[in-house]
Amino acid sequence: MNSLFASTARGLEELLKNELEGLGAESCQIVQGGVHYQVSDRLMYQSLMWSRLASRILLPLTECAVYSDLDLYLGVQAIDWPAMFSSDKTFAVHFSGLNEVIRNSQYGALKVKDAIVDSFTRKNLPRPNVDREQPDIRVNVWLNKDTASIALDLSGEGLHQRGYRQQTGQAPLKENLAAAIVLRSGWQSGTPLVDPMCGSGTLLIEAAMIASDRAPGLQRKHWGFTGWSKFDPSLWSDVTREAHERARQGIAQTSSRFFGYDNDARVIDRARINARNAGLAELIGFTTQDVLKLTNPLAQGPVGTVLSNPPYGERLDSEPALIALHGQLGRIMKTHFGGWNLSLFSASPELLSCLQLRAERQFKAKNGPLDCVQKNYQLAENPTGAPAGQLAEDYANRLRKNVKKLDKWARQEGIQCYRVYDADLPDYNVAVDRYGDWVVIQEYAAPKTIDPAKARQRLFDVISATLSVLDLPANKLVLKTREKQKGKSQYQKLGEKGDFFEVAEYNAKLWVNLTDYLDTGVFLDHRIARKMLGQMSKGKDFLNLFAYTGSASVHAGLGGARTTTTIDMSRTYLEWAERNMRLNGLSGRQHRLMQADCLSWLRDADEQFDLIFIDPPTFSNSKRMDESFDVQRDHLDLMKDLKRLLRKNGTVMFSNNKRGFKMDFAGMEALGLVANEITTKTQSQDFARNRQIHNCWLITHAGKE
């Protein structure tokens, strides 16, 4: 009997054990990452030929303690390598694992290689050559703490390499994992199988191999045992001949039908080539088609299974589209595949929840480094009633109510950018803003006490509900995560798309960009303040400090300001401000834009203005500023500098976002200034719930006429 070890992906050990026992293996013992088992010579070859789930099959040789590199060398050399293979065979060493003395896997492999070569030369035999690409013999060494396990790799290349797949998509599944997904899906051989997002066709091809009794190793050209001294060519020939005969009979007898779809014609071409290479082209029909147009190819035929590995996203900006895709996929399944089974394999259980289906079974597995889940669903024949798991129902109802009221108000006001939801419900801590026919969802960072998986699930529910309530295409939704800003974070670039579009705010037109920056180019809560500035500016010299994209200057210019001066430290935002001014026909020498540290400029300026708008940061310690700034601590110093620039009958509109800001009235009186709070006058309906989003003041000289 041969004692072997079959490795597999984490989570598939039990499935592999059942497969090996079905092949006739004895004494099967599961360990993490594989199964130890015992077989005769014939069953050894059959397990290599027929295992659909094993990654590799190893013949353990010995174990040795490794407290020094010499221990490793001697432990390997103790094996009679010339009895394993002859000098004319090539070999390679795969070494994994580190400890305190073997700190580099390449060094470990080198010591093993030296020990093997020396075992030949010590017997005055020619030294075998190393071939890292396609050796006759592969030696596998795994170092776990202070123990090295040494084995012959009978597989050669990984067993997932069946030989049919020269063409793959962007994110292919390994064939042995695909086979496991098929086996766990609930699909029964003889029934139809549909993959609506098939990519390079691996799931369908593996299923067709099962249905047609085709051995997964039948097309492999190279094995790790053919250079082994104990290789029995006659026995292997019998195993191979039997596999060919079973495949010939199986493809003639199978009644299963397989259907694969993908929206990329090039990917479908690759899938067809792979199926042809596998000898299964006649069983699988591949069609170029968007999943959203999917219907049941056997609407009047037998009940089958829909099986797929749908896309998932690691980038934040891909999530709205994927959430919408999964929601639509769930509706398609319920509409066209009643009575069928559905099985989906994904690295994102949150996305699977968007199907609004209740899973009957689920399995876990690793796909490389990714933790994945496979969920099986039984689709009702005649679906009725509410879907399983109404997503964010409270949020959806509140959003629906808000939109009904605010959309009408916005049309009457002549504005296209406004907030429709502002963390109204504690469980759904997001802000939702409309920008024309676009929507931005800003997720406020969850407290550390909230389970990240739970927070992510709620966000997915919010996105799905928003798309549904607003009847919004996913490509019109932008997702942002907002955390407490520090320093220059408001200037942080998020992307390079450069997607600007025009929106209306009263009589002004403004450019917004929803994707490239944390902020969009217009602060919605200051909308009424900008309108007031426009009404106050006729015939006046207007100064806009910390101007951002200059939207206040646009309103002042349209209101008839004699001059506008727009100052910000960011060149990017000043260029944006210039575009906004030009968009509204405001150009010429009377409309100045200056890049400067606003606080330094204030201290040095000797100009006079009638109307000044200043909206400084709550706190800033930018490297480009000479010193830190705290609006609560430093607002009197700020007012002292502003007073010097303010004409006798002039007005400063001072706003900030500091919660709990307290105006130093005594200090203002000492400066000869009067402050009148106008916060309630600058708050609009869409920010009615958040009275502390900003505070706003009109500052004048004491005794102003």
Swiss-Prot record:
Main location: cytoplasm
Enzyme category, top tier: transferase
Gene Ontology CC, one term: cytoplasm
SUPFAM superfamilies xrefs: S-adenosyl-L-methionine-dependent methyltransferases
Localization terms from the record: Cytoplasm
Keywords annotated in UniProt: Cytoplasm, Methyltransferase, RNA-binding, rRNA processing, S-adenosyl-L-methionine, Transferase
Gene3D superfamilies with a match to the protein in the record: 3.30.2130.30, RNA methyltransferase domain (HRMD) like, Vaccinia Virus protein VP39
Annotated THUMP domain residues: 43-154
EC identifiers of the protein: 2.1.1.173, 2.1.1.264
UniProt-listed InterPro entries: 23SrRNA_methyltr_KL (IPR017244), DNA_methylase_N6_adenine_CS (IPR002052), RlmKL-like_Mtase (IPR000241), RlmKL-like_Mtase_CS (IPR053943), RlmL_1st (IPR054170), SAM-dep_methyl-trfase (IPR019614), SAM-dependent_MTases_sf (IPR029063), THUMP_dom (IPR004114)
Name of a matching Pfam family: Methyltrans_SAM
One GO MF term: 23S rRNA (guanine(2445)-N(2))-methyltransferase activity
Source species, domain of life: Bacteria
Reactions listed under catalytic activity: guanosine(2445) in 23S rRNA + S-adenosyl-L-methionine = N(2)-methylguanosine(2445) in 23S rRNA + S-adenosyl-L-homocysteine + H(+); guanosine(2069) in 23S rRNA + S-adenosyl-L-methionine = N(2)-methylguanosine(2069) in 23S rRNA + S-adenosyl-L-homocysteine + H(+)
Family: Belongs to the methyltransferase superfamily. RlmKL family.
Primary role: Specifically methylates the guanine in position 2445 (m2G2445) and the guanine in position 2069 (m7G2069) of 23S rRNA.
PANTHER family: RIBOSOMAL RNA LARGE SUBUNIT METHYLTRANSFERASE K/L, RIBOSOMAL RNA LARGE SUBUNIT METHYLTRANSFERASE K_L
Protein name: Ribosomal RNA large subunit methyltransferase K/L
Annotated organism of origin: Erwinia tasmaniensis (strain DSM 17950 / CFBP 7177 / CIP 109463 / NCPPB 4357 / Et1/99)
Gene field: rlmL
